[in-house]
Every structure is written in C-alpha cells, then in structure tokens.
Regions:
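Non-heme Fe(II)/2-oxoglutarate
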Residues: 121-122, 126-187
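Active-site region of the double-stranded beta-helix
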Residues: 21, 47-54, 63-73, 81
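Non-heme Fe(II)-dependent double-stranded beta-helix
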Residues: 1-42, 48-51
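A short beta-loop-beta micro-motif enriched in histidine and acidic residues
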Residues: 45-57, 102-103, 109-110, 132-133
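A structural signal for short, well-ordered beta-strand segments
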Residues: 28-30, 60-62, 137-141
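Active-site glycine-rich loop that binds ribose-phosphate moieties when present
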Residues: 40-48, 62, 92-100
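Non-catalytic surface loops within mature trypsin-like serine protease
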Residues: 34, 64-66, 141-143
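Double-stranded beta-helix
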Residues: 67-126, 146
Length: 187
C-alpha cells in the first residue's frame, strides 16, 4: 500500500503536472509530534534538497491525523511564487528579517488531506499544545531527469546523522541538511 501510494501511477501523474515531467521519489518520512512536542523553525527545503545536484522539488504532505493550530499544523507563508532562497541563518533556517517579512497561514487538515508545495515555499509549524499526537507523512519528489537519488540520500543521511540506536558515545552528530528547522536537541 505504501509503495503504491508514493510511487503509483495516480500519484506520479499528479506530481508530473507540478514538475512538468515524470517525478521521482527523493525521500519520505513520517513526523510524529507528540503532545508537548516542539515545532519546526521557519525554513525552505530547497537549500537542503539541492545537495544531490537537483534544483526543484515538490513535497506531498498527507495528514494521518487532524492538523490544527493547537497541535502544531503546517504553516506556510503567503507569498508570490519564489524560485530562490530567502535570507537564512547558518543552520539553514530563515533569518529573523525573512520571517518578519512574511505573512503566515496555518494549513489545518483532516486525516487523508493532501497538501502539495514546492521546495521554495517558506514553512514552519508550532509546538503541539494539545493532548493528542499529530502524525504527518511527507514525501518529496524531484524531476526524473534530475536523477534517482533516493538510495544515496538515505545512505548519506545514515552516515552523518544515524538513528539513535546506531550512534557512538562521545561523537557529535550534526543534522546539517538532513533536519533543517528540526527542534530536536542533538547530543
């Protein structure tokens, strides 16, 4: 079911309309935001996603649970179409000046709702102030002519930012491009 959802013809045909050619799955993840979980700082995905030589991506967000302002739903900036990166901090989050110059809109969703946005859309989310978890599936696609880098992406991510169970004591892991805006503290 998962493969058909992310890489089936129905989904790829929809994404082809947005990237103007066949799309290739670049990466996917599920974000779990537990009650009290922190939000994600304002950022654009493009600076992180270009590390494999690609320039443009479209992300599909599928709500597993209801997304509300109380549980930290996605917020996007209301802006004209961007095709460049805004002013950023060293950690690739948007600078205070960039954030202050944007008008933010919460994207409240019901389970099963899809939200599609490209890699230049500024976005963020607030903390989960509710007493229920909020889960969201994110799948990011690039133009097929830019190449299939999914395996390389996850190999490199595991090398520089391994799961907790694979980390060695005393080693400092820097999330870098693999967790832009992520509120998780790294030890």
């Amino acid at each position: 079911v998962y493969a058909e959802l992310l890489q089936g013809n129905a989904n790829l045909n929809l994404l082809a309309l947005l990237v103007n050619e066949r799309a290739a799955l670049f990466k996917e993840k599920i974000n779990f935001k537990l009650p009290g979980g922190q939000g994600f700082s304002a950022h654009q995905d493009a600076p992180a996603f270009t590390s494999f030589g690609q320039r443009f991506h479209v992300t599909m967000m599928l709500s597993i649970d209801q997304g509300t302002t109380d549980n930290g739903c996605l917020e996007i900036a209301r802006t004209s179409r961007l095709d460049n990166s805004l002013d950023m901090n060293e950690d690739l989050t948007l600078s205070d000046n960039a954030v202050a110059g944007l008008r933010w809109m919460p994207v409240e969703t019901a389970p099963g709702d899809l939200v599609l946005f490209d890699s230049y859309v500024p976005h963020r989310s607030a903390a989960n102030f509710s007493d229920v978890s909020r889960r969201v599936l994110y799948a990011t696609y690039n133009r097929a002519t830019d190449g299939d880098f999914r395996t390389q992406y996850f190999t490199e991510k595991r090398r520089v930012f391994p799961p907790d169970v694979e980390r060695r004591e005393g080693v400092q892991y820097d999330a870098g491009v693999f967790n832009v805006g992520n509120p998780v503290a790294f030890e």
